[in-house]
């Protein structure tokens, strides 16, 4: 009886390793939800990008749901999602932009070319805010409630499908 129990920890460990390997093979960055969901958003630590002051912690706690979008001029998926961000802005959604690991000239050139969907924005060239928020790459978007709590994280571009399935229900207050 003792010999079969001796192998139980090994089997349990093999199960965890197998589950982890399977999860990594899914290639869906959203399969791993943020540990910040339901918690207060980390501090906003940004440098100015252009003449305007960057957004602040107070901007995330003004009673309105907002998107916090991490992006970069060198990021191809950021170009893909950009028209959808412009559409959200036109729908009245406030989007706070965080230019991540980029240069001011390139970031401003990107916005001059593509248009700016951002209500307010700032730069995070040293990845200080990105580390606090758990950003692994761009684009990455967080939905933040009016009290400054993170509702969800979306890794990858905001496609029409992602907006319909993940963002619209949160904005309407009908998400699970």
Curated annotation (Swiss-Prot):
Cell location: Periplasm
Signal peptide: 1-19
Keyword Signal part of the UniProt annotation: yes
Organism of derivation: Rhodobacter capsulatus (strain ATCC BAA-309 / NBRC 16581 / SB1003)
Keywords: Cytochrome c-type biogenesis, Disulfide bond, Periplasm, Redox-active center, Signal
Listed GO biological process terms: cytochrome complex assembly
The protein's name in its UniProt record: Thiol:disulfide interchange protein HelX
Manganese keyword on record: no
Function: Required for disulfide bond formation in some periplasmic proteins. Also acts as a disulfide oxidoreductase in cytochromes c biogenesis. The cysteines of apocytochromes c must be in the reduced state for covalent linkage between the two moieties to occur.
Cellular component aspect of the GO annotation: outer membrane-bounded periplasmic space
Disulfide bonds listed in the record: 75-78
GO molecular function, one term: disulfide oxidoreductase activity
Pfam families: Redoxin
Residue ranges of every copy of the Thioredoxin domain listed in the record: 35-172
Similarity annotation: Belongs to the thioredoxin family. DsbE subfamily.
InterPro entries in the cross-refs: Periplasmic_diS_OxRdtase_DsbE, Redoxin, Thioredoxin-like_sf, Thioredoxin_CS, Thioredoxin_domain, Thioredoxin_ResA/DsbE_sf
SUPFAM superfamilies linked to this entry: Thioredoxin-like (SSF52833)
């Amino acid at each position: 009886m003792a010999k079969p129990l001796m192998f139980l920890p090994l089997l349990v460990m093999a199960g965890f390793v197998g589950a982890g390997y399977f999860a990594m093979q899914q290639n869906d960055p959203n399969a791993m939800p943020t540990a910040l969901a339901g918690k207060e958003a980390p501090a906003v630590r940004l440098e100015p990008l252009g003449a305007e002051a960057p957004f602040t912690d107070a901007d995330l706690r003004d009673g309105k749901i907002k998107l916090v979008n991490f992006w970069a001029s060198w990021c191809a998926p950021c170009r893909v999602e950009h028209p959808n961000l412009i559409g959200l802005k036109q729908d009245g959604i406030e989007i706070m932009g965080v230019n991540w690991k980029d240069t001011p000239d390139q970031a401003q050139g990107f916005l001059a070319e593509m248009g700016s969907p951002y209500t307010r924005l700032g730069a995070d060239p040293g990845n200080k805010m990105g580390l606090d928020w758990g950003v692994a790459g761009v684009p990455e978007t967080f939905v933040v409630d009016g009290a400054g709590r993170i509702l969800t994280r979306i890794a990858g571009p905001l496609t029409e499908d992602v907006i319909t399935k993940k963002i619209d229900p949160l904005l309407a207050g009908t998400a699970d």
